[in-house]
């Protein structure tokens, strides 16, 4: 399978962030840094990309995020929004992206099948969406999750600019 270039993946979102002088930070999990890599691949990324972290394990989450509310489960819309809001607040950005899921080839410890992910964007507008690719292909899922997160950022950044 072939994948788009990293800059092409984030191009629409990056163009909107640059045009609107807005910033973004990322807390990602099953994408393993692919969302951040796509944003940084755009020339001039330092104008809009502030930073991020890979929250791959509970230990990583404890190090990078505030304590999550009791009863909040990973790989849910609630948790993805928690990631997005937390990283946005921690980094002082206009937008925050949160991503959590199961890239494959098997499910995650929370009972989600491979290909399940939740991406969220928090900022002037916020939304979380659930993805279900139905595939166990780890790399293909990582690209699909990253594309969904960056497409959601572009959609919300465009809406907020109106």
Task: List each model region and its residues.
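Short alpha-helical segments enriched in small residues
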Residues: 1-162
């Amino acid at each position: 399978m072939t994948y788009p270039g990293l800059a092409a993946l984030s191009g629409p979102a990056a163009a909107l962030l640059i045009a609107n002088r807005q910033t973004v930070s990322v807390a990602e999990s099953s994408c393993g840094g692919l969302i951040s890599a796509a944003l940084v691949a755009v020339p001039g990324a330092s104008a809009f990309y502030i930073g991020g972290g890979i929250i791959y394990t509970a230990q990583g989450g404890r190090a990078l995020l505030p304590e999550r509310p009791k009863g909040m489960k990973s790989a849910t819309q609630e948790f993805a929004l928690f990631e997005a809001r937390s990283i946005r607040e921690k980094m002082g950005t206009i937008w925050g992206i949160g991503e959590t899921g199961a890239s494959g080839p098997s499910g995650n410890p929370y009972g989600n099948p491979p290909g399940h992910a939740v991406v969220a964007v928090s900022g002037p507008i916020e939304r979380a969406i659930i993805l279900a690719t139905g595939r166990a292909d780890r790399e293909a899922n990582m690209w699909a999750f990253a594309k969904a997160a960056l497409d959601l950022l572009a959609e919300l950044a465009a809406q907020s600019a109106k």
